């Protein structure tokens, strides 16, 4: 059973079903957009997933989740959950309704910004919903702003503590800028595994990969080639350590780093040493001293010039007078 709480047109669900096998996969989805839900149903038809048509629901997942347990009291839980939540959508009208469900949103609900209401960090609610919707052995993935993975306070930090302390987080891949069609925000993909069998978390910094191109609207985007995709996938699956690209760290190591899931914070700092003779050292030091002396002298000259100009200023009572 595969589920997407912010399904859109079903791109992630279709990719997931192809990996699992359409004949072995049942799709469940919900999306606030009626248009997107219609497109998703068309995708289900085209991809041989007709039996899942009735499971594609239009509605507000956070306020009124449709897919429930048999008794209707709890969220239904799934084997796989994927989500690409909205980053720019106004949820101010439903914020209080969401906040009235603390059992579901255990880390809290973000406040609505006074000016840009659409910039509310609603993705934090979807992270909590994804985790709640996973079976005890379930696996999940969600697209998030990269800033989340180094959060030091607020709801974001509470979630980081939860997923690390409970050993729910399996890995994190920081993607290049502008790699997703619907946002220019720097994003990462956060992976969950509720079985808690892994002893290490794989962190990948893929932000430097990809090549720039312009889309149909003339906007700059970045795309990954097949080799780069294979590098990310292969490294992730093998939990391979690659210099300046990936690390595999224990949960305790993550705690020591303040619960950061940024690969770059775990890379070894390299210091290159160059052998030089005593004569070369003395020459370099002499050059440094001469350069600094010249810069100090110029700074002193400028200070004197500024003081000279200030002393030359005089009060003029006629300035601003209408006479």
Residue ranges and their predicted role:
Residues 1-83, 88-92, 97-99, 144-147, ...:
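Conserved S-adenosyl-L-methionine
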Residues 75-323:
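A conserved structural/catalytic subdomain of Rossmann-like adenosyl-cofactor enzymes
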């Amino acid at each position: 059973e595969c589920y997407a709480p912010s399904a859109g047109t079903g791109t992630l669900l279709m990719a997931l079903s192809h990996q699992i096998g359409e004949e072995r996969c049942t799709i469940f989805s919900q999306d606030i957009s009626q248009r997107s839900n219609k497109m998703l149903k068309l995708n289900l038809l085209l991809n041989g997933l007709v039996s899942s048509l009735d499971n594609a629901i239009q509605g507000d997942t956070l306020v009124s989740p449709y897919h429930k347990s048999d008794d209707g009291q709890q969220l239904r839980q799934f084997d796989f959950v994927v989500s690409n939540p909205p980053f720019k959508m106004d949820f101010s009208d439903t914020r209080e309704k969401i906040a009235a469900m603390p059992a579901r949103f255990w880390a809290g609900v973000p406040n609505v910004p006074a000016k840009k209401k659409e910039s509310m960090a609603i993705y934090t609610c979807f992270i909590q919903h994804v985790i709640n919707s996973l079976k005890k052995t379930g696996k999940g993935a969600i697209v998030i702003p990269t800033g989340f993975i180094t959060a030091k306070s607020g709801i974001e930090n509470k979630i980081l503590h939860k997923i690390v302390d409970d050993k729910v987080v399996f890995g994190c891949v920081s993607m290049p800028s502008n790699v997703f069609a619907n946002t220019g925000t720097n994003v990462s993909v956060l992976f969950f595994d509720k079985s808690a069998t892994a002893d290490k978390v794989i962190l990948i910094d893929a932000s430097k990969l990809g090549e720039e191109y312009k889309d149909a609207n003339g906007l700059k985007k970045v795309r990954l080639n097949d080799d780069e995709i294979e590098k990310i996938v292969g490294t992730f699956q093998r939990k391979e350590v690659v210099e300046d690209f990936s690390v595999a760290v224990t949960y305790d190591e993550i705690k020591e780093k303040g619960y950061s899931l940024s690969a770059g914070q775990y890379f070894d700092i390299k210091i290159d040493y160059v052998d030089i003779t005593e004569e070369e050292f003395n020459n370099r030091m002499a050059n440094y001293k001469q350069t600094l002396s010249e810069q100090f002298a110029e700074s002193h000259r400028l200070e004197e010039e500024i003081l000279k100009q200030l002393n030359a200023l005089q009060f003029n009572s006629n300035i601003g007078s209408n006479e």
